[in-house]
Amino acid sequence: MKNIEELILKAVELQSNGLVTGQIANELNVSRETVTWLLTRSKKDVVAPAPKDISVTWNSVGQSSYRLRCISQALCDMVIEKLERTQQDADLVIGIGLSGIPIATMMAEELEIDFAIFHDYDDQKGKTNQRGIFSRNFADVEGKKCIIVDDVVSSGATVTDVAEQLREVGATPIAVAVIVDKMNADMIANVPMSSLVRITRVD
């Protein structure tokens, strides 16, 4: 996306196609707050201050299985480096739907461990105050030592939800791996985070 006007048009288009705020945020790789601002900004008579956020577009990676594999291997290397320091081994890689799934799939293959999927509550057609769920069609997370994978971390809410639910079923989140970290954090939900790109906003 080249500018704010393009983001506004894309947000409005996605909303008209039936996507809810969280889904639009995932698609545009911005926070929910930014999506709300973009949608209200599309109404010309509304003036609100812009939220402090950054749109991330990584479709040049996502459209190529080769590039996805390279990114996944780099994330594996970073996670292994952190796990070796704490002498831990992972049993399972969890991909957060939608964009974390292809990366997590390749990471699980590279690490030769099981794979699971977490569906964020925003995938559940706009239901509010709902928690995400682990898919029953993939590996069981109970009692496992897990690596959580997503494309972009903006506020950390989804990763925190995953980590909390893992702990509730006796699993241990031992690492988080993302392409882009917009929080500029080493830890999220008391779990070490590795990212290929860390964004720091300087005002």
UniProtKB/Swiss-Prot annotation:
Residues passing through the membrane, by range: none
Record keyword Transcription regulation present: yes
InterPro entries with a match to the protein in the record: GfcR-like, PRibTrfase_dom, PRTase-like
GO BP term, example: regulation of gene expression
Keywords assigned by UniProt, alphabetized: DNA-binding, Transcription, Transcription regulation
GO molecular function (one): orotate phosphoribosyltransferase activity
Family indicated by similarity: Belongs to the purine/pyrimidine phosphoribosyltransferase family. GfcR subfamily.
Record's comment describing the protein's domains: Contains an N-terminal DNA-binding winged helix-turn-helix domain and a C-terminal regulatory domain (or effector binding domain) resembling phosphoribosyltransferase (PRT) domain.
Protein name: Transcriptional regulator GfcR
Organism, scientific name: Methanococcoides burtonii (strain DSM 6242 / NBRC 107633 / OCM 468 / ACE-M)
